[in-house]
């Protein structure tokens, strides 16, 4: 009796311990996922910048907003330590990303404001580390699902602010009435929702069973793009829609691949021809003038500033900081307080010189080729790696997204490029994982 009782109790205790361990693992996993979701939302810049940034000085940095980043950096370090071997392996496979970030930090030695460069270089390092963590921690499906969920939350929050709190969710002074959602400015909001639309479609492609959520959210995101009245965002969203269905045809109907490629080449050639020889008509078609709402005037003024420090730049993150510094003459000539270059390539040139532009250019071209190679070797992640990489280039032409500290676009690009350079196996809904370099099976 006693022996049996002891055996029963021991078995009961083992089962209880196993149950507790399982619960603890689920709890830790939930906490980790919650932290990752929080970090993605924080890096989006939504809501915090809207509330804390001075609308009369968009280039200024709120001390409170800066302090809020330190807890996030601590969380990134804790997450990175937990998966350190995988993170180091991912970094080793991505020397170009590491070199680009290190070069921005090295600009401390010739920076016009060394303390600012040091602080923002550390922020860039933490931003990039978070992108590498996402690449190391999650497979393609897990990454896309988490990014899509974060953007779905941002889309719903933006719609709520625009409808229920229009003094926050809509532009008040310039572009009055245009929706800006949880962002500070309508173009940032529109481009964010264009990226959200692409993520919703990619998440649906990876998990069609969740279409009841992703499809309506995609429609909401496209509606928010329209409400932002941003032409750049509309072009980006239209590209996402057309590109998604083009890749769908490419994957599903091999017999149509050659006609599809001819159609793409002819379309790009025609658009390029019209932009060169019918510039005014093309801009009028999308409701823009030649200056792209003053952007070309900004770029022309910045050419003179770039000529002063063409190879090394002014130091990472310093050009726009001092109102009496080198940016003074740009703002003086344009007669308004320009906050950024509104172009990622120009911004990078100002910060870290032509060397940084060349380094990132090599990184981007390699990433694009690896993304296109996925059309032959990859799985359902094809939609994201091809369209997301090209969309990043499109957005960088009108917004400062390249090598930007505390910026979600840079986090996502790093995560995507890092997985490409690491030759992450493709994601298939109904097939086992196989090595990247294994020849793909013919698609019927």
Where are the regions a protein language model picked out?
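Transmembrane signal-anchor hairpin modules in multi-pass inner-membrane enzymes, especially those
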Residues: 1-105, 139-145, 149, 204-208, ...
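Alpha-helical transmembrane segments of multi-pass inner-membrane proteins
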Residues: 73, 101-106, 145-174, 183-249, ...
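Hydrophobic transmembrane alpha-helices and their immediate junctions
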Residues: 136, 213, 246-249, 253, ...
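A conserved mid-to-late transmembrane alpha helix and its immediate loop/hinge
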Residues: 222-224, 229-233, 333-371, 394
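Long extracytoplasmic/lumenal interhelical loops at the membrane interface
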Residues: 284-300, 304, 308, 312-352, ...
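Transmembrane alpha-helices of multi-pass inner-membrane enzymes
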Residues: 386-395, 400-444
């Amino acid at each position: 009796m006693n022996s049996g009782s002891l055996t029963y109790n021991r078995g009961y205790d083992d089962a209880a311990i196993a149950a507790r361990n399982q619960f603890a693992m689920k709890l830790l996993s939930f906490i980790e996922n919650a932290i990752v979701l929080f970090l993605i939302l924080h890096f989006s810049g939504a809501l915090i910048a809207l509330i804390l940034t001075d609308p009369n000085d968009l280039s200024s940095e709120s001390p409170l907003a800066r302090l809020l980043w330190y807890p996030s950096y601590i969380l990134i370090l804790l997450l990175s330590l937990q998966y350190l071997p995988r993170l180091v392996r991912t970094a080793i496979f991505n020397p170009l990303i590491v070199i680009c970030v290190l070069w921005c930090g090295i600009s401390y030695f010739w920076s016009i404001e060394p303390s600012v460069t040091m602080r923002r270089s550390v922020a860039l390092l933490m931003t990039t580390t978070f992108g590498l963590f996402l690449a190391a921690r999650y497979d393609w499906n897990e990454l896309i699902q988490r990014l899509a969920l974060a953007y779905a939350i941002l889309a719903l929050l933006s719609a709520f602010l625009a409808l229920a709190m229009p003094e926050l969710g809509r532009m008040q002074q310039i572009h009055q009435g245009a929706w800006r959602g949880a962002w500070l400015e309508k173009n940032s909001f529109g481009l964010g929702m264009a990226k959200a639309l692409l993520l919703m479609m990619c998440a649906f492609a990876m998990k069609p069973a969740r279409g009841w959520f992703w499809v309506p959210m995609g429609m909401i995101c496209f509606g928010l793009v329209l409400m932002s009245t941003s032409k750049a965002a509309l072009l980006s969203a239209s590209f996402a829609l057309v590109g998604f269905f083009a890749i769908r045809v490419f994957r599903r109907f091999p017999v149509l691949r050659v006609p599809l490629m001819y159609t793409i080449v002819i379309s790009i050639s025609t658009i390029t021809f019209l932009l060169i020889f019918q510039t005014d008509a093309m801009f009028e078609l999308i409701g823009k003038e030649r200056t792209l709402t003053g952007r070309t005037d900004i770029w022309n003024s910045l050419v003179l500033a770039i000529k002063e420090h063409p190879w090394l730049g002014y130091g990472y993150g310093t050009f726009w900081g001092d109102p009496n510094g080198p940016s003074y003459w740009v703002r003086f000539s344009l007669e308004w307080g320009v906050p950024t270059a509104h172009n990622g390539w120009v911004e990078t040139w100002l910060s870290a010189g032509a060397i940084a532009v060349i380094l990132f250019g090599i990184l981007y071209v390699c990433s694009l080729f690896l993304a296109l190679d996925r059309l032959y070797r990859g799985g359902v992640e094809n939609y994201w790696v091809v369209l997301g990489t090209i969309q990043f280039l499109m957005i960088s032409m009108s917004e400062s997204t390249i090598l930007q500290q505390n910026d979600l676009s840079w986090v996502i690009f790093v995560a995507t490029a890092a997985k490409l350079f690491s030759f992450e196996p493709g994601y298939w809904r109904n097939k086992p994982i196989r090595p990247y370099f294994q020849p793909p099976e013919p698609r019927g």
